[in-house]
From Swiss-Prot:
Ligase keyword on record: no
Ribosomal protein is among the record's keywords: yes
Family: Belongs to the universal ribosomal protein uL6 family.
Pfam families named among the record's database cross-references: Ribosomal_L6
Recorded GO CC terms: cytosolic large ribosomal subunit
Record organism: Rubrobacter xylanophilus (strain DSM 9941 / JCM 11954 / NBRC 16129 / PRD-1)
UniProt entry keywords in alphabetical sequence: Ribonucleoprotein, Ribosomal protein, RNA-binding, rRNA-binding
UniProt-recorded name of the protein: Large ribosomal subunit protein uL6
Annotated function: This protein binds to the 23S rRNA, and is important in its secondary structure. It is located near the subunit interface in the base of the L7/L12 stalk, and near the tRNA binding site of the peptidyltransferase center.
A Gene Ontology molecular function term of the record: rRNA binding
GO biological process, one term: cytoplasmic translation
InterPro entries recorded: Ribosomal_uL6-like, Ribosomal_uL6-like_a/b-dom_sf, Ribosomal_uL6_a/b-dom, Ribosomal_uL6_bac-type, Ribosomal_uL6_CS
Assembly with partners or alone: Part of the 50S ribosomal subunit.
Length: 177
C-alpha cells in the first residue's frame, strides 16, 4: 500500500465533497475545485474523511493511488486556506508594480514587462521588490509563479533577477583579472 495513498483526507466543516465516477468536486469558502480520479482508483467518503482505494497492485494503479490522494488533499487545503507563493526581486533598479490586476516588471530590459494573472489567480505587490501569487489551485499558483520568474531568472554572478522566497542561487566566481 502507498503510504501517501493510505492516509485519509480530512474534510473540515464548511467544505462539501461531491463524488462522481471519474471526478471529485470540492467546494469550500474560497471556491470550488474538481479533481479527476484516475483508472483503478476509487474515492469514498466516510466519517468526514475521504478514503482513496485502488483496485489492484498494478504499477499504474499504485502510482494513481498516491497521486489522487495528494490532489484531493491539495484541493481541500486550497478551498479552505488557499495557496501563496512569494517571489523576491533583486537587482539595482529592478522593481514591480501593480496596474489593475496586472503586474508590470522593470527588470533590466529596455521595456517594462507586463504579466497578466491566470484565471483564479491574484497577484499582490506588497513592496516594489516582492510579488505574492495567491489562488486556490496549487498547480496554477506554482505555474504562475514560474512564469513570472522566467521573465528574469536569477543569474549566478551577482544574483540579480526574480527568485522564489527562500531559493538559494548558486553563485559563481567572476573572471580573475
Amino acid at each position: 500500500m502507498s503510504r501517501i495513498g493510505r492516509a485519509p483526507v480530512e474534510v473540515p466543516g464548511g467544505v462539501s465533497v461531491e463524488i462522481s465516477a471519474r471526478s471529485v468536486k470540492v467546494r469550500g469558502p474560497k471556491g470550488e475545485l474538481t479533481v479527476p480520479v484516475g483508472r483503478g482508483v476509487s474515492v469514498r467518503e466516510e466519517d468526514g474523511k475521504l478514503l482513496v482505494e485502488r483496485s489492484s497492485d498494478a504499477p499504474q494503479h499504485r502510482a494513481m493511488h498516491g497521486l489522487t490522494r495528494s490532489l484531493l488533499h491539495n484541493a481541500v487545503v486550497g478551498v479552505t486556506d488557499g495557496f501563496a507563493k512569494t517571489l523576491q526581486i533583486s537587482g539595482v533598479g529592478y522593481r514591480a508594480q501593480l496596474q489593475g490586476q496586472n503586474v508590470v516588471l522593470q527588470v533590466g530590459y529596455s521595456h517594462p514587462v507586463t504579466v497578466q494573472p491566470r484565471e483564479g489567480i491574484q497577484l499582490e505587490v506588497p513592496n516594489p521588490t516582492t510579488i505574492v501569487v495567491r489562488g486556490i489551485d496549487k498547480q496554477q499558483v506554482g505555474q504562475m509563479a514560474a512564469e513570472i520568474r522566467r521573465v528574469r531568472p536569477p543569474e549566478p554572478y551577482k544574483g540579480k533577477g526574480i527568485r522564489y522566497e527562500g531559493e538559494q542561487v548558486r553563485r559563481k566566481v567572476g573572471k580573475a583579472g
